[in-house]
Amino acid sequence: MGRLFGTDGVRGLANGSLSPELALRVSGAAAQVLGRGKTRALALVGRDPRASGEMLEAAVTAGLTAAGVNVLSVGVLPTPAVAYLTGLYDACLGVMISASHNPMPDNGIKIFAAGGHKLDDAVEDRIEALVAADDPVRPTGAGIGRVLNASGARDHGLHIPDQYSVEGTHERYVEHLVEATGRDLSGLTVVVDCANGAAAEVGPAAYREAGATVIAINAEPDGLNINDGCGSTHLDQVRRAVVEHGADLGLAHDGDADRCLAVAADGSVVDGDAILAVLAIAMKESGELAQDTLVATVMSNLGLHLAMRAAGIAVRTTAVGDRYVLEELRAGGYTLGGEQSGHVVFPKYGTTGDGVLTGLKLMARMAQTGRSLADLAGVLTTVPQVLVNVPVSDKAAVAAAPDVREAVADAERELGDSGRILLRPSGTEQLVRVMVEATDPVKAEQLAADLAKLVASL
């Protein structure tokens, strides 16, 4: 068995590589590691609406309860909501069943530790070791975990706030988002593409509660249509809708709503780098940007670094994945970080990327300044970037192949100071990602094509 955990949990083809049996073993191992030594341990379980979620939730619940941990299901909610509620309800772990932006046939298991924090590598290694050993601890009798509702959880001595019920988790999360926004959004009209995913209910509700006029699209999940030509990886629909409705902006989420990309009134795309630039400058002005520092990943465009330098903001760089962004935020005491893909983390309000909160904060900046999104995003001039995703059978071996490393070194020498190259295995899919940035867009296209051709040949 290869490594189970990727950049963001365990993912695979539902009922294929991600089988119910594997889901049971992973959740049982997680319960042993994260629930060890805790009496009346509680796990929260949520999911996105893809069809396989119900099957995998049943398997995860079986694994957790078989390990002696009680389970509280919060139903279909965004990943950041599950993380937030894990902390709010004082659970020893939370589980989100989702493959995020991946196609519907895939699914995944994201695990949060107490407080809603993502797992570090050492904890993942301990869970993987238990899965590989396949010798689970199995209590009997009263030691078996129970599947609880809110009142039942309180009857078992678990910490579920009296004013909240499982049925009210959506409302509580929306309240949390609106409180964090801190500004009335009346007068702004937004098109929200919910990707037929976990944001379909809470996304439009939060934007409306904050005062905005909301036009929701792709907000009718049926289990099969999640991410199907919509959401943050397919922006054509939201771009058209913004122009057709004369909206001030559009916001696009992915299947589990932990990311957000934006569209200006003219239909132009505002990516995660531009969103980070706008929010970092806003927080610097308000004194909320700790140490005048933004945390970004190696995938962020060179243009972000140049824009932040001009604004007097330092940039700390991490590996790809919002878990690594969060680790750097916590280690340095910083207050804003994120990725070009639209994961933005506000550690004051949550422990993972939150797409809906990102959209609310972006709109709050528009309301505060009275400026259009295109005007605000103009602070960043993107250096031409080409990203090619190359399907391969063994992503780690191909990315580390001597021929590939030599070709990358040659291309870097050719670019000199006028660009950069990043070639890495995807953390979530069987792909090698080839990214080339260069002030000469023709040069960027050619180098990316040459490297992608080499990768595909191996």
From Swiss-Prot:
GO CC annotations, alphabetized: cytosol
Keyword field: Isomerase, Magnesium, Metal-binding, Phosphoprotein
An example molecular function term from Gene Ontology annotations: phosphomannomutase activity
Pfam families associated with the record: PGM_PMM_I (PF02878), PGM_PMM_II (PF02879), PGM_PMM_III (PF02880), PGM_PMM_IV (PF00408)
Phosphoserine modification, residue list: 100
Cofactor needs: Mg(2+)
Entry annotated with the keyword Isomerase: yes
Top EC category: isomerase
GO-annotated biological processes: carbohydrate metabolic process; peptidoglycan biosynthetic process; UDP-N-acetylglucosamine biosynthetic process
Coiled coil, from the record: none
UniProt PTM: Activated by phosphorylation.
Cofactor comment: Binds 1 Mg(2+) ion per subunit.
Catalytic reaction(s) noted: alpha-D-glucosamine 1-phosphate = D-glucosamine 6-phosphate
Residues binding Mg(2+): 100, 254, 256, 258
E.C. numbers: 5.4.2.10
Active site: 100 (phosphoserine intermediate)
Family assignment from sequence similarity: Belongs to the phosphohexose mutase family.
Function description: Catalyzes the conversion of glucosamine-6-phosphate to glucosamine-1-phosphate.
Protein name: Phosphoglucosamine mutase
